[in-house]
A protein has these predicted regions:
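Rossmann-fold NAD(P) dinucleotide-binding segment
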Residues: 58-70, 74-121
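Flexible, active-site-adjacent loop/turn segments at secondary-structure boundaries
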Residues: 14, 76, 86, 125, ...
Length: 151
C-alpha cells in the first residue's frame, strides 16, 4: 500500500446510497482526502460541497487513492466496479481495496484473487447497523481477508 500513516491515506469511496453517503461523510469529517464516485452525481454533491473530490468513473477514483472502499447495491454492481479495464483493480496503484457491500463468499474470494494479481490487497467487509448506524458512525463491520492487509 502507498500510505505512510492512516491519517494521510487518500481514500476513494464508490457508492453513495443511504449507507455510503454517511460513511463517506464521516471519513471526510475526520480529515481524510476523499475522492468520490456514484452513478448519480447529485448524491455526491453535499460531500463535494464540503471538500470531497468528484470523479467521473470508478477508474479515476482508483487511480488517485491509496484505499478504495465500495458500498454498492448488489454483487453485480461490485463486479462492474471492481473488474474489467475500467474497474478499480485495473486502475489502482498498489492499493487496499475494501468491499463493504453484502455479497457472496465466492465473490469475495474471486475479488481477493483478482486484486492480488493486480498487486493490491483486498478485504471483504460487510456491515450491520443500517442507515441509523451509518449516520451515527456505529456500524458493526465483519472483515474477512488477509490478516496483513487488515493490519
Amino acid at each position: 500500500m502507498n500510505t505512510t500513516s492512516n491519517t494521510t491515506a487518500r481514500i476513494g469511496f464508490i457508492g453513495l446510497g443511504i449507507m455510503g453517503q454517511s460513511m463517506a461523510g464521516h471519513l471526510l469529517a475526520a480529515g481524510h482526502p476523499l475522492a468520490l464516485y456514484n452513478r448519480s452525481r447529485e448524491k455526491a454533491q453535499a460531500l463535494v460541497d464540503k471538500g470531497a473530490q468528484w470523479c467521473d468513473t470508478p477508474a479515476q477514483v482508483a487511480a488517485q487513492s491509496d484505499i478504495v472502499i465500495t458500498m454498492v447495491g448488489y454483487p453485480s454492481d461490485v463486479e462492474q466496479v471492481w473488474l474489467g479495464s475500467e474497474g478499480i483493480i485495473a486502475n489502482a496503484r498498489n492499493a487496499l481495496l475494501i468491499d463493504m457491500t453484502t455479497s457472496s463468499p465466492e465473490l469475495a474470494v474471486r475479488l481477493a484473487a483478482e486484486a492480488e494479481k493486480g498487486g493490491h490487497h483486498a478485504l471483504d467487509a460487510p456491515v450491520s447497523g443500517g442507515d441509523v448506524g451509518a449516520r451515527e458512525a456505529k456500524l458493526s463491520i465483519m472483515v474477512g481477508g488477509d490478516p496483513a492487509a487488515y493490519q
